[in-house]
């Protein structure tokens, strides 16, 4: 009887450990789903893999931090790229594209950091001296230094102005 009881206790401990591990995983997936509510299925599926696949950094919206008064301008400048998935390199991006295809989860756009070298800046630096110019969009955000190339690529050619009329005047020149 003692041996049977010991075996059952050992089995119970294994089952409890397994239960807690799965409960923790479920909670983690729920948090990801809630956090990425409003994103496409493919993006949510990739972000569910973030803790299991090294090299997934997050979506652009998670990486770029903006002061409240510039949020609308930066979100507008980013457009759909705000939901693009940032990876360390092309291999991680390829792996996740394969994951999406294999499971028929849809498509997503990936931005490997190894391919982000800036957008070359604006052609006419004189435009920054025009009335109403606040600055280049990439200078109005905060990112970790490893994401500087990404920020430059996405926002380094966008001038933020205080009023649409100033923007129109600059665009016409």
Protein language model annotation of sequence segments:
Residues 2-6, 13, 20, 27, ...:
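Residue-level encoding of the coiled-coil heptad register
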Residues 1-2, 116:
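Short, compositionally biased low-complexity segments
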Residues 21-173:
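Hinge-like oligomerization/junction regions that interrupt long coiled-coil arms in large cytoskeletal
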Residues 7-14, 87-89:
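Conserved short loop/turn motifs at secondary-structure junctions
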């Amino acid at each position: 009887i003692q041996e049977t009881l010991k075996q059952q206790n050992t089995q119970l401990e294994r089952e409890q450990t397994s239960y807690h591990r799965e409960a923790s995983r479920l909670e983690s997936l729920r948090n990801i789903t809630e956090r990425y509510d409003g994103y496409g299925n493919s993006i949510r599926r990739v972000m569910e893999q973030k803790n299991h696949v090294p090299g997934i950094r997050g979506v652009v919206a998670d990486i770029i931090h903006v002061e409240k008064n510039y949020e609308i301008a930066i979100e507008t400048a980013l457009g759909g790229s705000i939901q693009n998935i940032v990876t360390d390199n092309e291999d991680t991006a390829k792996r996740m594209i394969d994951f999406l295809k294999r499971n028929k989860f849809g498509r997503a756009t990936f931005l490997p950091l190894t391919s982000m070298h800036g957008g070359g800046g604006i052609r006419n630096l004189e435009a920054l001296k025009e009335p109403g110019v606040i600055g280049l969009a990439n200078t109005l955000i905060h990112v970790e230094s490893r994401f500087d190339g990404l920020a430059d690529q996405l926002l380094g050619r966008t001038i933020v102005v205080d009023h649409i009329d100033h923007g129109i005047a600059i665009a016409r020149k």
